[in-house]
Amino acid sequence: MDYEFLRDVTGQVIVRMSMGHEAIGHWFNEEVKGQLTVLTDVEEAARSVAGSERQWRRVGHEYTLSLDEEEVMVQANQLSFTTDELEEGMSYYDEESLSLCGLDDFLTLVEKYREFVLH
């Protein structure tokens, strides 16, 4: 999972993720937006599910983050899309709507994001 942190002209931190992990970058850009308390909540949740079969979920405005002791899933909160509505020859692109990664990799990303924001 490759990622890059940038600042836009307003100073807002932007996360760019490798292909297949775009939704995770969108989650940081849309749901975190530099609010480190969101990351603290996620880290506390990760500790709370460790060694159990419990799951934790945070529903945001655009994306929902779910985690268990092994994996993190970020999914867009969009309404389900019916492919029957598409014109012939058209397809629906949803690769940026769902991303999965290991919990340890995600927590490393959270740590690196926090460091970038604070420096």
Curated annotation (Swiss-Prot):
- Parts of the chain that traverse the membrane: none
Alphabetical list of InterPro entries matching this protein = UPF0231
**What is the native source organism of this protein?**
Pectobacterium carotovorum subsp. carotovorum (strain PC1)
**Where does this protein have coiled-coil stretches?**
none
Q: Which family does it belong to?
A: Belongs to the UPF0231 family.
Protein name according to UniProt:
UPF0231 protein PC1_3552
